[in-house]
Amino acid sequence: MIRERFPQAPAKRDVIGQLPTWVSWESMPAAEFSPSLWRIPVGIAEATLEACAFELYEGEHAMVAGNPRSGKSSLLVAFARLVSRARAAAEQAVSAALASGDATAAENARMDAAEVPEVWAVFDQRSGLVNAPEGVFDRVFESKNASAQVQAALQDAAGPVLLLIDDGDRVDDPMNVFDAIVKGDFPDVHIIATGKPTDLRPLYSHWTKAIRKFRTGAVVQPNVDTDMDMFGSIPRRAPVQLSVGRGYAFLAGSPVLVQLMSPEDSQHRGGL
């Protein structure tokens, strides 16, 4: 009857959204950096269909657990691309402030730009990070010698650092530098590491064990029978298929079903 009375009325839109199966880093909001808090987007939350983010306070770190080809390494590259975008925006703000002749605005813009971290990456030749876009990492360290190399590099670091460590369960720490970072000895350095759940779990005295205690991270394509205890409990049944890049992000200790962002551009999907 209503359709007959109002034939030109648009059809009612479906109020139930659908979690996308792929999300580009380009569609994510800007990463935010301050001395006390970093907010780095990770993907789209199933419950809200809005972007969600890791929140890392001073001295905090995150872990992304998943099996090979689950999408965990790709997420590290996406993080790096978000930081690169933030740096470019900060540099543009400085240039605009200088061009305006406003000395106060220029100084404030410089201070904001100084809060954007450098991105250092630790990986080996088997890692998906070898295919990252050129220039996305400010420094690269080979997994085998990373402990000593990162320790030396930190002596020259002039500002904050986002340290991305792929397959952290295979990265030893003879110099105890990663352990020192996790304990808060370098408050301007935040680690986001990846690892395979079955390899992370038995590492009781490894530096990755301490990162998991922060309860910020993600479990990608989790096995509900074996991965329930990585950061906290997760639902045994998901409302959607847990395909590549899907899993549970732990935000402030609570699990959120997400589609993680991809490091690929919208126009070049499949290139990484």
Question: Where are the predicted features?
Answer:
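Phosphate-binding and hydrolysis-coupling loops of NTP-dependent motor/remodeling domains
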Residues: M1-E46, A51-C52, P202-L272
